Amino acid sequence: MSGDATRTLGKGSQPPGPVPEGLIRIYSMRFCPYSHRTRLVLKAKDIRHEVVNINLRNKPEWYYTKHPFGHIPVLETSQCQLIYESVIACEYLDDAYPGRKLFPYDPYERARQKMLLELFCKVPHLTKECLVALRCGRECTNLKAALRQEFSNLEEILEYQNTTFFGGTCISMIDYLLWPWFERLDVYGILDCVSHTPALRLWISAMKWDPTVCALLMDKSIFQGFLNLYFQNNPNAFDFGLC
């Protein structure tokens, strides 16, 4: 398996060759939360894969043959099949590969996890808007209040279930699908938005003990370096921290 810490490909780069038999390829970017979702599932299910990182400020021309809008993540199989959108990609991996199933077998429980994901849908946008506001020196009181309310809604679910994880007594797909945005709260400077949610904070602590989550934790100083360059519109941001 090629590591996640590979330099990005940008305009003028040559496209990678065919995906080797027995592997699946992920087109990714080290700091992207949506790609992070799919990488968590690849790791949790111990799926042999290779990583091709894409420079999102300087996308290769050929990459638009992988995704019509140039988004990440995209999975590519050795049969040249392409699967994109992070939740769809994660569900594909869970269905297509053996090992522990991350989505529940029970149809209702699977549906319940997908409904919970819908309740989470405002969080990615709000976290990004808070980050941009703080980085640009803008007032973000209302944004943070809105984010706190979303976290209060998630807190209520954990309290009602009386479980550590959103999927129950152990980690399942829904926990991995939510996690990337919670890992970023500290480096984004908005960790205080969960100060009022003890059950959610307990979930965050429990997630950090998971071997899959631990394996993909990003060094905070490297993440900060990426953000510093990203907000300077520096195309080298995506390779920050690599030799």
Swiss-Prot record:
Reaction it catalyzes: RX + glutathione = an S-substituted glutathione + a halide anion + H(+); L-dehydroascorbate + 2 glutathione = glutathione disulfide + L-ascorbate; methylarsonate + 2 glutathione + H(+) = methylarsonous acid + glutathione disulfide + H2O
Q: Which UniProt keywords apply?
A: Oxidoreductase, Transferase
* Domain annotation GST N-terminal: ranges: 22-101
Q: Which GO terms describe its cellular component?
A: cytoplasm; cytosol; extracellular exosome
Q: Which domain of life is it from?
A: Eukaryota
Report the GO molecular function annotations: glutathione dehydrogenase (ascorbate) activity; glutathione transferase activity; identical protein binding; methylarsonate reductase activity; oxidoreductase activity
**Tissue range of expression?**
Expressed in a range of tissues, including the liver, kidney, skeletal muscle and prostate. Strongest expression in the testis.
| Keyword flag Oxidoreductase | yes
PROSITE patterns, per the entry:
GST_CTER, GST_NTER
Domain (GST C-terminal): residue spans on this chain: 106-231
What EC number(s) has UniProt assigned to this enzyme?
2.5.1.18, 1.8.5.1, 1.20.4.2
As recorded in UniProt, coiled-coil segments are none
Where do the catalytic residues lie? 32 (nucleophile)
Locate the residues binding glutathione: 59, 72, 85-86
Q: Answer whether the UniProt record assigns the keyword Oxidoreductase to this protein.
A: yes
Reported effect, residue 34 to A:
Abolishes DHAR activity
The Swiss-Prot or TrEMBL record describes its family as follows:
Belongs to the GST superfamily. Omega family.
Q: What does this protein do?
A: Exhibits glutathione-dependent thiol transferase activity. Has high dehydroascorbate reductase activity and may contribute to the recycling of ascorbic acid. Participates in the biotransformation of inorganic arsenic and reduces monomethylarsonic acid (MMA).
- Its recorded name reads Glutathione S-transferase omega-2
Organism, per UniProt?
Homo sapiens (Human)
The opening ranks of the lineage are: Eukaryota, Metazoa, Chordata, Craniata, Vertebrata
Name the gene that codes for it.
GSTO2
